[in-house]
Amino acid sequence: MQQPLEQAVAETILQRFESFYSRFLEITQGSKSRFENSDWLGVQLAGRERIRLYDHHVGATTALIKQMMGATLPSQALLKQVKGAFSDLLPKCENFEVAESFFNSVYRRIFRHRNIRDENLYIHPFRSRGEHPDLSALLRIYRTDLAHLPQTLSQLLGDYSFTLPYEDKQRDIVDIQRHLAENGPAILHDEPFAIELLKEVFYRNKGAYLVGLIRVKGQVFPFILPLLSTGQSIYVDTVIFEPELASIVFGFARAYFMVYAPMPALFVLFLRQIMPHKPDYEIYNAIGCQKHGKTELYRHYQQHLAQSREQFVIAPGIKGMVMSVFTLPSYDVVFKVIKDEFTPPKDVSHEQVKAKYRLVKQHDRVGRMADTQEFTNFEFPLDRISPELLAELKTVAPSALTLTDDKLVIKHLYTERKMIPLNLYLDKADEQQTRLALEEYGNAIKQLAAANIFPGDMLFKNFGVTRHGRVVFYDYDEICYMTECNFRQIPPPRYPEDEWSAEPWYSVAPNDIFPEEFATFLLQKPQVRDIMMQLHKELFDANYWKMLQSNIKEGVFEDVYPYRRKKRFKFQRGG
């Protein structure tokens, strides 16, 4: 007897999902070996391959389902039956949350992001793990107090085995205990506590992270140990117990962690305890499930929309030449729409802009480039769009809009975490805030450059300040690889009148960049000029940029830490 079509389609989608996630975990599992062997190029390549997996498998699955269904579009009755059959299979799937997202992606790909109905796909989750699922199988739990902490830490570090030995385990134990005793929560001095660590190690860039929490008298504090490698041995670089720093470690501007998580939802539930203010979608993104993070973001957005009454408005700041940006004032996300025509002198195409955003998605963002999600045919309630915003969108991006009686549908947009534009921040900052922001700004450019990214347009308006005070780049239409740039010094004028000429007295090729010119548009205010020349004067020297290029070409991978240098034990010991 032939299997019903809806059953065959549902089983095929689930099988293809499991094939995708099996390969996802296989790539992830190689992280330990890459860390132990200091295979930093392999780290980058594996990260890119893993990001590309999802779309590849969704595309292949879509083609197969279309073949199974035939040339005619399926009826609404059949679509409901397919979802029903898939829902019947979910109890057997341990990673059902991400499986729902995979089903959604296949459905949307088939229907080109139209016919989005709750009865056809998983706008709301079908299953739940409940409020308090048992996480004990994921954890190692150590009960101790400050007096017995050295013995506990010795056991703890020994439980995480690597082919490389610890450089000096006793030194690391002393550093951890000292830092907790001097700077940790005061309650640790008076009460016994438990350290709960996830058994699986989190890998990113050159680091391996033991991630967990301290539980004491009903209170919870993060407990994160970043491990680094010398090539011959490993060492503990610091201990993180501050919720704010834990949030930065899992920040939206960093590369995705590699952690072996067959059931990522359980990891998210655990991590939520140490980052209670970070939404689930950002945690899913951080552990590499960014496509399910997109599903969670959409659900989060729908929930916020239902609980608020305000209107979407044009985002504060200088209007972009390429993007129109808007937001809901109470929501921590901005929406970015590519304009139909770009404001001169911008000379890029729509496809080039999209390619830049794809580049950022697959590149190591080193904590300095905001992650984005890409949406097609995104719907907004028309009565929630302010008149000014609607007029703006009709003016700059009419081809992207579809209006119905009660909806505004935008054909293509990006979402991004909301930040304060750096230029607006500096307008209101006092002297200390200005200095810290400019220090962050220069560090952001240097770290991006060391990661082979040249921002292109370095105006302050293209950078944002996060709630933690970090400066992050978010305007990608002019980025390029450092290795594509030709950094030059401006040649001396041939004659005195050359300096007054409207045209340069030297030839300029498309990829020529003159760092001396950065000062013209960045250092107009005396206070900004003084601070930048104190902290980052090398940014205006072509030789500095050439040195960075040389490092990149020689395969030098810079160290980038998700915490300040003074937090490192090596710095505290005077190393």
Swiss-Prot record:
Database matches in InterPro entries: AceK_kinase (IPR046855), AceK_regulatory (IPR046854), Isocitrate_DH_AceK (IPR010452)
GO CC, one annotated term: cytoplasm
Enzyme Commission numbers on file: 2.7.11.5, 3.1.3.-
Superkingdom of the source species: Bacteria
Keywords noted in UniProt: ATP-binding, Cytoplasm, Glyoxylate bypass, Hydrolase, Kinase, Nucleotide-binding, Protein phosphatase, Serine/threonine-protein kinase, Transferase, Tricarboxylic acid cycle
GO molecular function: [isocitrate dehydrogenase (NADP+)] kinase activity; AMP binding; ATP binding; phosphoprotein phosphatase activity; protein serine/threonine kinase activity
Binding positions for ATP per the UniProt entry: A315, P316, G317, I318, K319, G320, M321, K336
Function: Bifunctional enzyme which can phosphorylate or dephosphorylate isocitrate dehydrogenase (IDH) on a specific serine residue. This is a regulatory mechanism which enables bacteria to bypass the Krebs cycle via the glyoxylate shunt in response to the source of carbon. When bacteria are grown on glucose, IDH is fully active and unphosphorylated, but when grown on acetate or ethanol, the activity of IDH declines drastically concomitant with its phosphorylation.
Family membership: Belongs to the AceK family.
Protein name: Isocitrate dehydrogenase kinase/phosphatase
